[in-house]
Every structure is written in C-alpha cells, then in structure tokens.
C-alpha cells in the first residue's frame, strides 16, 4: 500500500511539473512581447518630451515644465486628455474606413519592431527576410492614411491621403535599393546577420564607411517616409488644414500622432542597425564581452549593454530628425516628387550597381 501511495504522489508531482512547464512556456512567449510594447511606449513618451524641449530651445522659449519634473509627464497628460475626449464621426463619411484607418497605421508600424536586434540575443523574431519585412509592412501604413482620407468625406482629408500615398511610393523605391545594397554587403536579409557582419572590424566595419551615398539616400528617404518636416506635405496646415487628420478627434486623432513617433523611432533604429553597427560597442577589434572581461554566457549583462548602445545611437538620429524639423522649411509637392524620382532614385540605383559590381569582382 505504501508503494502504491508513493507512485500516486510521483504521478501527481509529474503532472504538476508538466503544468508548470506549460505555464512557463506561455509566460516566456508573451513576456518579450509585453516588454517590447512597454519599452516602445516609454520611448514614444520620451521622444515627445525631447521634441518639445528641443523645439523650445531652438525657438528660444520655455518648454513644458509644470507637468512632472522638467515636464516629462506632459505627453502622458495629453494622451489621457485625448483618451477621454469624444470621437466625432463625419455624418456622410464611410464609418468603417474612418475607424479602421488609424489602427492600420499603428499596427503595421508596431509589427516592424519584431525584427529589430536591440542587443545580444535580444530580438523578438530573427527572420531571414527581416529588412524586407519592415519595408513590406511600412508600405501598408499609407494605405491606412488613404482610407482615413477617403472615409472622412472631406476634400482636404482626401488630398492629404493621396499625398501620403504618392510620397510613400516616391521614397519607398530608393529606400529599398539602399537596403538591397546593404544586404549584398552582408550576404543576408536578416537584421541580426547585418549587425554581426559590421562587428568584425569595430568602428571601421560600419556600413556607413562602405555605403556613404546609400546612407545619405536612406536617411532622406526615411525622413520622407515618416512625413516629417521638410516632408510633411500630407498634413500641411496652410494648404490642407490638417490633411487626413482634419475630421479626427479623441483617441483616433491621438493614434495618428503615436504612429508618427513610432515610425520615427523605427526609422532611427534601422539607421542604427543597417549603418552604425547596431549594438556593437564599435571599438576596433574589441568586442563587448572582451572589453568588460566577461564571457558571452553572462547574457543578461551583455544584452543590457547592447540595448544601451543601440538606444544611444538611435537617440542621436532622433535628435538630428527633430532638429531638422524645426530648422528647415517645407518643400512644395513638385519639389518633393522631383527629389525622389530625379535625384534619389538614380543615386540609389547607381549605388546598387556599384555594390553589385564590387561584390562580383571580389569573388
């Protein structure tokens, strides 16, 4: 009888252990996603605060200072206000398109964060086509803007949506050609492999030095994709009131601003990953683990250092993007399209041909 009870206890313990493993597996699946969403949310709030402080400094005025220490909670207060404001719907508009448009813009950008290697072994999904996934998903966001403009039943909103689609098409092609050049140099479309390919020679192994023209074209194209000044024609206040945002209010209006800053952040992250070595410390011939005299088995410490390096490089480009917005005037629509089709496209195509030729001769 004692043996029988012991066997029963072992079976019960085994089943409890299996259930704990299942629960742990579920937690392990959702924990990185929740951490990523929390980090993205905090980053967006930080970017909004940085933009207000930088713009205040450029315009020689005082920025937000009362809501929290140094005004850091001002963006949170504005978001809370928009959350409780009424969502107005145009009486003759298409309600379904009007409601779905902002969500498509935000969700399509959030998915792109899954292929960003923030640090050593810290990437949500290491896909073999990581950079192309970002390009494919980023081309979906203008569809949401076009749906919003059409569903608003407003001529200014519709023109803003058309401008967003035209601008996206004009600058998506040069950006894709620049990414192809980077992929040829790294022999991979995976973001993790692209970062590893730049880590062999430290600072001088960055793709910035191997692709200077591609970097300039990519930087301009990414700013145009984010619809930031001097490329914010889809929402030009003097011409289109607020573009595709004209009829929106409440949380739906706030989603467009969230999408704008999410897009700016992901573009800066891809500049860091593709051209500035990602999470590498960038000291020639010295890796992070060797520099701190630790082994890669101490993954948490290495990952934290990698995340810090990645974000430091990313916020440098965020600062440049914000400073550009508050110092340069807006282009006309013809100037914007001419820049994309007549200048950036030939330069990026020539850069791709040169990269392909150099790779063929090096075989």
Swiss-Prot record:
Keywords of the record: Chloroplast, Membrane, NAD, NADP, Plastid, Plastoquinone, Quinone, Thylakoid, Translocase, Transmembrane, Transmembrane helix
Transmembrane segments: 26-46, 104-124, 129-149, 253-273, 300-320, 336-356
The reaction(s) this protein catalyses: a plastoquinone + NADH + (n+1) H(+)(in) = a plastoquinol + NAD(+) + n H(+)(out); a plastoquinone + NADPH + (n+1) H(+)(in) = a plastoquinol + NADP(+) + n H(+)(out)
Enzyme class: translocase
GO biological process, any: photosynthesis, light reaction
Domain of life: Eukaryota
Membrane topology of this protein: Multi-pass membrane protein
Subcellular location, record wording: Plastid, Chloroplast thylakoid membrane
GO cellular component terms attached to this protein's record: chloroplast thylakoid membrane
Subcellular location, principal: plastid
GO molecular function: oxidoreductase activity, acting on NAD(P)H, quinone or similar compound as acceptor; quinone binding
Protein's job: NDH shuttles electrons from NAD(P)H:plastoquinone, via FMN and iron-sulfur (Fe-S) centers, to quinones in the photosynthetic chain and possibly in a chloroplast respiratory chain. The immediate electron acceptor for the enzyme in this species is believed to be plastoquinone. Couples the redox reaction to proton translocation, and thus conserves the redox energy in a proton gradient.
PANTHER family xrefs: NADH DEHYDROGENASE SUBUNIT 1, NADH-UBIQUINONE OXIDOREDUCTASE CHAIN 1
Protein name (record): NAD(P)H-quinone oxidoreductase subunit 1, chloroplastic
Organism: Glycine max
